[in-house]
Swiss-Prot record:
The gene is nolB. Residues 37-57, 94-119 are annotated as: Disordered. Keywords: Nodulation, Plasmid. It holds the Pfam family NolB. This is Nodulation protein NolB.
Length: 164
């Protein structure tokens, strides 16, 4: 069974999109520019393409100064305390439902997950912490000594194997 086959060159213009035409036009212009650069002599002046003036881009919404955006962000994070814009004397006003001053610490409720590892719940005993660090130091020292001992033995065995 034979199927009719049309030539690719005949069907290409129908299939090709406008981007192929633009690409071909660009390649022709690039080839012409390369040829003209090869054929140019030192006596001919260099032609440059005219540069269009820069276009001003206007934003759809006017931008606010950085200080205003920072204050808005802080106000959105802390909805109870709204920070007003600074006055000419550079002091920011704090509009708040809470009294000014340091923040109050939240009460810690006893329960799962509140105990730190290795530290008793009741208080932080300094002597217990120092004893724990001393034990850790002794353990690390023992591991280092064992590691150095094994390294020395390995080195000696390697020397004996080389000497035969």
């Amino acid at each position: 069974m034979m199927l009719p086959v049309t030539s690719i060159s005949n069907s290409l213009p129908r299939v090709a999109s406008s981007s192929f035409g633009e690409q071909a036009q660009f390649e022709r212009a690039l080839a012409q520019a390369a040829d003209s650069m090869k054929n140019d002599t030192a006596s001919t002046p260099v032609r440059t393409a005219p540069i269009s003036p820069p276009m001003d881009v206007h934003r759809a919404a006017p931008t606010s100064p950085l200080e205003d955006r920072v204050l808005q962000t802080i106000s959105s994070i802390c909805p109870d305390s709204i920070v007003a814009a600074a006055a000419p004397n550079h002091k920011a006003a704090l509009i708040s439902g809470a009294p000014p001053g340091p923040s109050q610490k939240l009460p810690v409720e006893g329960g799962a997950g509140t105990e730190r590892l290795g530290i008793p719940q009741g208080g932080h005993d300094f002597d217990v912490m120092v004893a724990g660090l001393r034990d850790l130091y002794n353990g690390v020292t023992q591991v280092a000594l064992v590691s150095k001992g094994i390294s020395g033995i390995t080195s000696s065995v390697n020397k004996l194997l080389k000497e035969g």
